[in-house]
Amino acid sequence: MQDLNAVQSLAVWAVLVISLLGIGYAFFIRSQILAQDTGTPKMREVWGFIKTGANAYLSQQFRTISILIVILTFVLAASVFIIPPTTEAVERFGSKEAATIWVAIGRAVAFLMGSLFSYAVGFVGMNVAVEGNVRVAAAARKGYNPALQVAYKSGSVTGMLTVGLGLLGGTLIFMVFGIAAPDALLGFGFGGSLIALFMRVGGGIYTKAADVGADLVGKVEAGIPEDDPRNAAVIADLVGDNVGDCAGMAADVFESFEVTLVSALILGLVLGDAVVGTIGDGAYDLRFIIFPLVLRAIGVVASVIGNLFVTTDERKRNAMAAMNRGFYIAAGLAIAASAAATPVFMVNEATGEVDWRPFFATLSGVVLAIVLDKLTEYFTSTHFSPVKETSKASQTGSATNILSGLALGMESSVWAILVISASIFTSVLIYAGEPAATQFTAILYGVSLTGIGMLLLTGNTISMDSFGPISDNANGIGEMAGLDKNARNVMDDLDAVGNTTKAVTKGIAIGSAVIAAVALYGSYFTDVNKVLQQMINEGRQGIELLASINVAAPPVFIGLLIGGAVPFLFSALTIRAVSRAAAQIVNEVRRQFRIPGLMEGKVQPDYARAVQISTTAAQKELISLGLIAVMVPIIVGFTLGVEALGGFLAGIILTGQLMAVFQANAGGAWDNAKKYIEEGNFGGKHSEPHKAAVVGDTVGDPLKDTAGPALNPMIKVINLVALIIAPIVVTIEPGSPGVIIAMIICGAALVWAIWQSKRESEALKEIAQAPASAD
């Protein structure tokens, strides 16, 4: 770790130790969870079905994507011969030959590490959630606080593993590569983002195919309660909560956590180079890199302390207040510690002045997370007028319910983008006094710190999100196992709170994805200009640095239009996948309802068939949607040029954010409008307004849990691909034969991916046509 002073070196080692302690704390909590009671034999039987289905899904998913991960690992290692090491890498390792070897190894290992860490977060998080749900149901028989403790601690395992592994990866790469860290960090971010995309898409399709199928036949047609054991899709629905809301969400936020760190380190290095001497002179001010690492470590410690305050008593029975208390205590500690760290790590050694601007940029991120939290709650909670209006609209049928939800979702996306824009503008104001030569980079560095501040309490955020599916599963197990009324009341209350926490954390996940994408967008400019500057230094004529992108230029405008269209294509394909699989589930549940004795409870449904349908449908889409995310920026960049690729990224960020918020909040509002009616309003359960609300909820399910969340990792994957290929796009001749041939191949792969995603699965046909074991 060259060029670090004694305090900075000590800080980096402390950050490494804290990341390991965070991981250790996660496994300590896991051991506490596993020591809890698993309940009655009937509870363990239902739990066994869920556990088998969840593990089978993730195992099959790993087999599906592992081949692609291995191929991309070798591609990134070989990319060093196309994208040569940076001047920083040559300086760090002493020669171009040594740098080539180290960068090849670094890109491949970092990509593999990012992939494995992201998968580990999803797999372990889901595994602990599955282990926790039956124990929450068992604890509910003892009281409210015991059940709350088990549910929240089960989610805390995922939260602490997310922050521990994310911080560990970034710190290790910096310790090994130093000023050459960006050469490897992009691989780390790309690996995590790609796995998050697979987890989000696969988990979202799985969970909503089962959920939509179970609701349409069970609630609407047969009129039986949710989680009724006679419904053949009920186990697939419960499994889906784990693979979608636990594994998928954990990998998604892990990706944002590491990508904001990656962008902060890349921009911090550029800024640290610019403020000392001249750019490229080998002198760096590394405080801009150390500070983000220290902030992340502070967040880990604050999350651990905050978790200790999540408790309530049998008299108050307020889980939401307990979790909010833990979050706000952690936030207060994190802000205070960040302020205390600023005079230590952000001192200009030349002047002795403390630079408080990074702290204020970080603080704006914490504020942004809280504001988005409240904004999402306003548009999706039963306590506020938007959801009540959607419930009221159900009195005149499902059409007015759906129209009300659509309007609500559209309006909410406007307010969300205004809030995010305000946070970005805050960074502009904070760095308004920065010299013109470094102002652009400094502003974007501030945006990356806003993202770090927003995810400073990732441990608490993930804990609250995972609390939702864990309590939902526990409630389902309690329903199917026939637990007593007191235990059911406890689980009903925790389930209702869990629905709120899931909706709120979705808003934070979307906001963090956009902030991360904007920071990566800034990294795109700095990377392009580094290559252009190197070409100028080599004496190339007619080359200018990329100061801005001219939207009036036809190629840029075309790129902007294509970028704006991609989120719609992605959403269309994921929703269609849910629709196809849900149709198969509907047919299967209808068929099993006709089995003699099943509706009377004398015959057990064949749960495995619905699980198999959902699993097969989810795996079918993974590679094709992954190819779309990787191929489109490559085609745009090499066909239209580097400025057009910048316009393309701007279009992706804008419409991706609007679509993600619209779909998440509209779906959340439809869900809670149904629950508001089920509480006894506008006729209550089994009334005509309730049936209309169930239809609205069913329409909203794939929006809020599949298409909307899948846009988060898609935006970041596309931005990272653009960052990786930017040095080639700048230097290569667009019309050369090699480029034309490569674009034809990429275009063919893209067409195949879209066709593959749209066609009906032969495997699903075979499952539907196969004889059933329960007949």
From Swiss-Prot:
Keywords carried by this UniProt record: Calcium, Cell membrane, Hydrogen ion transport, Ion transport, Magnesium, Membrane, Metal-binding, Translocase, Transmembrane, Transmembrane helix, Transport
Site positions per UniProt: Determinant of potassium independence: K502
UniProt subcellular location: Cell membrane
Function: Proton pump that utilizes the energy of pyrophosphate hydrolysis as the driving force for proton movement across the membrane. Generates a proton motive force.
Listed GO MF terms: diphosphate hydrolysis-driven proton transmembrane transporter activity; inorganic diphosphate phosphatase activity; magnesium ion binding
Protein name: K(+)-insensitive pyrophosphate-energized proton pump
Entry-linked PANTHER family: K(+)-INSENSITIVE PYROPHOSPHATE-ENERGIZED PROTON PUMP
One Gene Ontology cellular component: plasma membrane
Membrane topology (UniProt): Multi-pass membrane protein
EC number: 7.1.3.1
Disulfide bonds: none
